[in-house]
Amino acid sequence: MRKTRLTFIAALACIMMLGCTHQPQTTIEKIDCLKKQVVVDADALQTIANQDFVKLQKDFHYCDSLLQYLDAKVVEASFEHLNLTQAYLLQFKEVKPVMEKKMDYVVEQLGNLKSDAESHYLSDSLVLVYLDTETKVADTLHAQVEYFKDSFSKCQASLDQLKKSKK
């Protein structure tokens, strides 16, 4: 009877320990996944800056120079699109460095958080609190990247239409 009770207690302790060690592993996987998301978003931001932004800016200047040669109705219809494109370009120039710094900081914080979680320096609940905070920042950054992708795509389509009207 006593041996059975000890075996049961030992088995219960093992199950509890496995349950405790499983949670940080899941948390570590979440940290790694979030870190990968931020790195992918940082790469996407660089692609936007190096390709989409450059092309959009070039096409914007080209279309702006076309206005003097176009019909007044086309100019009037295009003017709003050109102003909107210019606003997105200026916004991107201002926001991009801030986004890059935030992305670098989040990646660094997630690396520190993973280290602290693996070494049990922080409690599981505190790790989850920090992870939630970093997740909110990462989600905001992701939304900003998607916003610029979408905005630049729409602006590019508008400029392409204007370029066609010249031909």
Regions found by a protein language model. Name each.
Residues M1-C20:
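Sec-dependent bacterial lipoprotein signal peptides
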Residues I9-A11, I15, Q37, I48, ...:
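Low-complexity, intrinsically disordered/propeptide-like segments
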Residues C20-E76:
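Immediate post-signal-peptide N-terminus of mature secreted/exported proteins
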Residues Q57-K102:
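Structured domain cores in non-transmembrane regions
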Residues A87-K167:
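Extracytoplasmic electrostatic interaction patches
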